[in-house]
Amino acid sequence: MSYDRSTAEAVIQLYLDGLYECDADKLGQAFHPSADLRWHEKGELNVLSYADWLERVRQRTSPKSQGHPRHDFVVTVDRSDETTAFVKVKCALPPRFFTDYLVLMKLNSGWQVVSKSYRYETHD
């Protein structure tokens, strides 16, 4: 299936929908294949490849299927030019609530996430 990647906003929505639905196909369209995910835990930097992350997504039960309400929204979009955007979003995979920092670039095939760094808190 082909998804809209004509704008950074469309890719952000695709990303948020993919997370809420645990839809690896949507997330795969939002991310560039060379992207990775980075987070800090116990004083250490952790790095996960895009392919390994999608495999984890495929194993999850989605918040949507569990009847959880959506907790996702865009906090900021900062564009340095017509081809690069830095986006901060809030989202949830209960009981974890995330702040994601996404770098998007407009490539020949459209906008894609090329890097993701995040932090999360656990709530009961």
PLM features per residue range, with description:
Residues 1-33, 48-51:
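Short, low-complexity N-terminal intrinsically disordered segments enriched in polar/charged residues
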Residues 4-10, 36-97:
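Surface-exposed, charged secondary-structure patches
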Residues 97-124:
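Short beta-strand edge/turn micro-motifs at domain boundaries
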